[in-house]
Amino acid sequence: SDVCSSDLSIDSLWKNVEWSWYKQFKDSPYLYWHWSPDQAWVINHKLIGWNETMITYMLAIMGPKYGISPEMYYSGWASQEEYAQEYRADWGRVEDGKMYTNGNTYYGENLKVGVSNGGPLFFIHYSYLGLDPHKFTDKYTNYFENNQKMAKINQRYCIENQGGYVGYGEDCWGLTASDFAWNYQAQEPMPHRDNGTMAPTGALASFPYTPDASMKALRNYYRNHGSFLWGEYGFRDAFNLTVNWVSPLFMGLNQAPVTVMIENYRTNLLWNLFMSHPDVQKGIQKIQSIK
């Protein structure tokens, strides 16, 4: 059937990615983000959490043909090296989020891992479209609980609305990466990374973590702003009421998490399918066996 054919094609693609080659050199503790035929590794950008690249390490560790060592989950993704600390500190421009293990309290939520104030919400969406955060706990935290805290921090920051932006509140929240009036940028709950631009995907793709707050945002966006925000493919990518701007784009990068995460909230469908794969189960067990 077409479904079986798709399953086999996806499996084949994942199994034949030479994940270990993206270490750049044999003893590297990291995977690297970019390579090109003419520039090779010149960008030299390491994959380090906290961001959207957890799933890259997970798929690489799970890979049966070209897999990487499960220890790279901690040496790479969860690295505590100075380089990794500098990368994390740059998100919030503060020191309290530079370690993978955070431990600070923001808006009443104690954040076990993550950057200061949790960062943009795509951090808790992209890696968890298939990976069920309820069922993944490493030696630091359970990722459903941690992700839920990040969503709550984001909403409470928007309710406080330090910048005085038009529209922000309990039903208009969810700072994340999106199109905006002057370019494309990752908005986050920090004053230096917040310019009043709101992307519907932020709150709507957080449905599994904050169903009531996400539903409030959905109703607000559709009922009160639908005349300019809703179109043939759903919600437009972003809007900024302070400068009277709405994106002309329907961006698949932000539409997909909304569709998938709402379905995961409703039925666990994508989570159940991904987590049922034997190699996924083995990979998670490998990571969890490291103490």
Indicate where each model-derived feature is located.
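Ser/Thr/Asn(+Pro)-rich, low-complexity disordered segments
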Residues: 1, 6-291
